[in-house]
Amino acid sequence: KNDYDKKIILNGVINKESSTIREILKFLRGTYCGPIGYEYMHISNPTERVWFRDRVEKDENALKFTNNGKYAILNKLIQAEGFEKYLHTKYVGTKRFGLDGGESLIPALEQIIKIGGQSKIKEVKIGMSHRGRLNVLANVLQKSYKRIFNEFAGEISNDGEDTAGDVKYHLGASSDREFDGNSVHVSLTDNPSHLEAVNPVVLGQARAKQFYHKDKER
């Protein structure tokens, strides 16, 4: 027990040159046993792993949200969960591949788009499989609930013939989102049931956008 208060040389680990076991345990419990779980030790690239660790452990990198920011996150979580609960109640047994348990994806995507707009990004291309796609369409791409519910009722209407008749959780959409006066065009690419098939398509689309926007700083 006396060893708990002996100084240990850390050489910068947990941002300290030295510390006691008691202090180390307190720090680790406060950082890794709180409301957020982190998983990054599986990353094979040591530079990426250290970057992630520094983002988690350094005080100056700690996430700090304003009250308005917290309200916006809560509002998006409520929208995401409410959407899933409604579909579960209204369309019992219908395939929808819900986002249940992963609703934090919605405010996370919103934040990425918002920060992107602040960084002068004009377009965002998204590729994803069908899990949570309907929620992203409704609450990030702002596809109307009416259109989504019509698709549940079997009324598939699409502007193009290429995707006409496809199931609702394969469809994509696009919209212009505005945050703090910055407009960002966001598009979600259609994807079949082959989960990762969309990945090279989105990479190619993003590369084409870079070419036509003369974006050479990539």
Each language-model region and where it sits:
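Conserved internal helical-beta-strand scaffold that buttresses enzyme catalytic cores
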Residues: K1-R218
